[in-house]
Each structure stands twice: as C-alpha cells, then as structure tokens.
Regions:
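FIC/Doc superfamily catalytic core
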Residues: 1-399
Length: 399
C-alpha cells in the first residue's frame, strides 16, 4: 500500500487529514525530531515501507558480498574504479557540472601515483577513500565544512568565487534552490546562526545509534538538503556524505552507486523533497525516508544484477578460452577478459606487463599471436593504446 502523504489527504474528501495526522504523530513508534519543517514539528512515522526497505537492503548486501567473493580481485578492483568514475560523473551531472569518464579516470590514475594535479582531484580522492571504510568525522559543523572543503571547494572557487562560503562554516546570505527547469522550489534556511543550529540538530539525528543506520542516513540527507548550508556544492556534498555512510554500513562498493540510482529516479527524488517541505504535509518526513530508502535499495539491486551478469559472462568466457586459446596465452586472455568486462577503456601494455609479470618483448609477442587469432581489440586514446578481448570474434569462433 502506497504511503499517503498528509497534503494529499487534506485535498481528499474521503480522508480525515487531522485524524490521520494525529494517528501518525502520536504513534509510539514515531520518531520526533528537535526541528521543524515549514513551521510544523518534524517527525518520521515508521511505516511498513521503511521496514521493508531495511530488510531488503540487508538481504541484497549479503548477495553482493557473495558475488564479490566469487570474482577475481583484479576484476573487482577494476569494477570498483569504473563505478567510482561513473558515480563522480553523475553526481557532477546532477548539479550541472560537466565532467567526462576519461577526465575523472585520468585524475584517478594520477591519484594512484600520488599526483595531486588536475581538476576534480578533491572529489576523486574522497570517493576513492570509500573502499577502505575510512572514519570521517561527522559530529560538528566544522566536520561538515571540512568535508565540503576537501570535496568541492576548489571547484566552486574556480566556477564562481562569489559562491565560496562567507560565514564561519556556511553561507551568510539567502539562497534559492531551483530544479532542473530553473524553477525555484525551496529557500534555504538563514541566517548562518540558524543554519548552524539546524545542522547541529541534523547531526544529532545522524549520530543517534539507537536508530537504524539507513533511516538516519535518509533523514540526514533530507535535513541537509532542507537547510542548504552552502551557496554551491550542496548536492555533491550531501550525496557524498550519504555514499560514505552507506559504504560504512553495507559493502563499500554500494556507496558508489547512489548518484546513479538518484539520477535514474531524479523526479521521484525531487518530488519527495517537495512533498515533505509543503506546509500541508505538517512536518511529516516519512515520504522522503521511504523514497530515499527505496532509491538506495535500487542502487543495491543495480549492483547485484550487474555483478551477477558479469560473473556469468566471465565464467562463459573462461570456459571458451580453455577450449579456443593455446595454454601459454590463457592467463593473458584472462586479463583481457577482465579488462573487457570490468573496465571502460581496456588495459594498457604497462598494466598487462605488471599483471602478467612479463617483459614488454614477451607481452608484444603474445599479443601478436592473439591478433593473428582475431581475439585482440586495440584502441589508441591519446598517447596510450588500450587492449580488450575482441568479443565478437571470440564468441563466433566454434569451440
């Protein structure tokens, strides 16, 4: 049964909106927050949809762990990098910031060499850390500002210096939130003293360990968006914090699928915000908690399905390799299969030499043999040549 928001109940002659509000607000399971939304005390009613999302997330997380354990480490590492790149491109895209997979991929490669140059270094570094389950402090306004500074401040300063935060931690002036069509949908809280007060309360919600983690993450995500503490970079900061928290609660790779899932359901995402901010909804944040929890579960489903498909493809390719490829070339073909299924561009000669522990001369000799068999796909991108398995030829060749 779809959760009926109070605004709709108010306009429905068949509903008693006051009675529905009283029942939810006074339910013993309801979580009352120390803040208000559009002038009404904020609360979350523990609807069945929330419990269903929590249970489903726990089950899918186990499925993802099982699939990860069944994949070679090289394949998993490559796929994590690919997910990380996609996540950053999409979180930028949602905010109207243009970036490409290649651009983010190059920053990631430089990061692995301890090279801090380049645009988007901060956001790439932050997301790359998620796979190690770092402990990022999120207890004070200063902590939130530190995340913002590391993540997007440099990019905001380049884009428009006037959007750099001008208060102790946050902005000091009014800001209007607009949707993708450029229509104002929300005014952020002001002045900074109130932003600080509201953010402190939101952080208290986030750190209340008596509550389910996904519930707290969803609530904080809403409250951060409602407060809108910065002039620019709010969405990217908010989604990163959610990704970080989810990567701590579930398998780390799950945190790299949040922006993709939000982008897939962007209308549902924004509509959930607007429903809860409406005065007639009377402070009930439950619709957003349900929507955001479902979006997170969908992110986990997407990941599970992708890993399942890639595991199936890899098993099939390895089986064909055992029949079609001469034994001395099989480990090289396995590396090419991994690059084909789990990366975007493929793999370079340098990476193949390191993975296979081969000299350049031996590698090129074996690549030449695969080329003669028709199993090698090559593409020059910039100065580098990337290699993949020629899937069409490999699949058409009779066993």
């Amino acid at each position: 049964m779809t959760y009926l928001d109070l605004r709709k109940a108010f306009h429905d002659p068949a509903q008693d909106a006051d009675q529905l509000y009283d029942r939810r607000f006074n339910d013993e399971r309801t979580w009352h927050l120390k803040t208000s939304i559009a002038g009404s005390p904020a609360f979350v009613y523990m609807a069945p949809e929330i419990y269903e999302a929590l249970l489903e997330a726990a089950q899918i997380d186990k499925d993802i762990l099982r699939l990860e354990a069944a994949l070679p480490q090289r394949a998993l590492d490559s796929y994590r990098d690919s997910c990380l790149i996609d996540e950053i491109v999409l979180t930028n895209e949602i905010e109207g910031v243009h970036s490409t997979r290649r651009e983010i991929g190059e920053v990631l490669e430089r990061l692995k060499q301890n090279d801090r140059r380049g645009r988007f270094f901060g956001i790439v570094q932050k997301y790359a850390l998620l796979q190690t389950r770092p402990d990022i402090a999120l207890r004070t306004c200063a902590d939130v500002r530190d995340v913002y500074d590391d993540l997007v401040l440099a990019e905001v300063r380049i884009s428009d210096p006037h959007n750099v935060p001008d208060g102790t931690y946050f902005r000091t002036k009014m800001v209007h939130v607009i949707n993708e069509a450029g229509i104002p949908i929300h005014d952020g809280i002001e002045p900074e003293a109130r932003i600080i007060e509201e953010m402190d309360q939101a952080l208290d919600v986030l750190n209340d360990e008596s509550r389910e983690p996904l519930l707290r993450i969803a609530l904080f995500h809403f409250l951060f968006g409602y407060i809108h503490p910065f002039y620019d970079g709010n969405g990217r900061t908010n989604r990163f914090i959610s990704s970080y928290l989810i990567s701590r609660q579930y398998e780390p790779i799950v945190g790299l699928g949040i922006s993709y899932a939000v982008k897939q359901e962007i209308e549902k995402y924004y509509k959930a915000f607007s429903r809860c901010e409406h005065p007639l909804n009377r402070g009930d944040i439950t619709p957003f908690v349900i929507a955001f929890s479902e979006i997170c579960v969908n992110a986990m489903c997407n990941l599970r399905d992708a890993l399942t498909e890639k595991k199936s493809q890899m098993d099939m390719y390895l089986h064909r390799s055992a029949v079609l490829v001469p034994e001395p070339l099989r480990t090289l073909v396995e590396s090419l299969i991994t690059a084909t299924l789990f990366t975007f561009d493929g793999v370079t000669a340098k990476e193949l030499c390191e993975a296979e522990r081969l000299s350049r001369q031996t590698l090129y000799k074996r690549l030449s043999e695969l080329r003669k068999l028709g199993f090698l796909q090559e593409e020059k991108i910039g100065r580098k040549v990337f290699y993949k398995l020629n899937e069409e030829a490999f699949l058409l060749r009779g066993c």
